[in-house]
Amino acid sequence: MSADAIPSQIPYVGVGCIVVRDGKLLLVRNQRGFWSTPGGHLEFGESPDVCAARETFEETAVTVRNVEFVAITNDVLADVGKHYLTVWMRGDAEGDSAKVGDAAEIKEIGWFSPDDLPSPLHLYFENLMAGRCWPPSPGNVPFAVTPG
């Protein structure tokens, strides 16, 4: 990368956390109206599993355990000029309560069956669902991943 690269042209690293409880996924609707899993930017020095747990708790007040790697998506949001590499993690919810934790970012949360997801989905989550990820994964395979 050249030293004079424009910061907006450098991809960001995001982390999404697939939270599963009783076969349902915890999803959040952001202020722009798109649904996805809890997630956010990886902070300096932070590992993806810690980021996934932190973001999930900040956005939904849900604690996750057994956090493990699922996939990576390459997400280009041309309309807003952003490019993300999203690291997808999966974790199990502790407890059964969830609430909007960060109202500045999140409008609504809910538990959904993988076969009955709300719309519109955020591009990141859409890419994962479609298997446009590494390692390649068709359809809903990430939701079948269970901790060892």
Model region roles, listed by residue range:
Residues 1-16:
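Acidic, metal-coordinating catalytic segment for phosphate/diphosphate chemistry
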Residues 15-17, 69, 89-91:
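A structural signal for short, well-ordered beta-strand segments
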Residues 21-58:
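Conserved Nudix-box catalytic region and its N-terminal flanking loop in Nudix hydrolases
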Residues 30, 34-35, 103-148:
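Nudix hydrolase/Nudix homology domain
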Residues 63-71:
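A short coil-to-beta-strand element that immediately follows conserved catalytic motifs
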Residues 75-99, 125-128, 132-136:
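Active-site-adjacent beta-strand/loop module that shapes the phosphate/pyrophosphate-binding cleft
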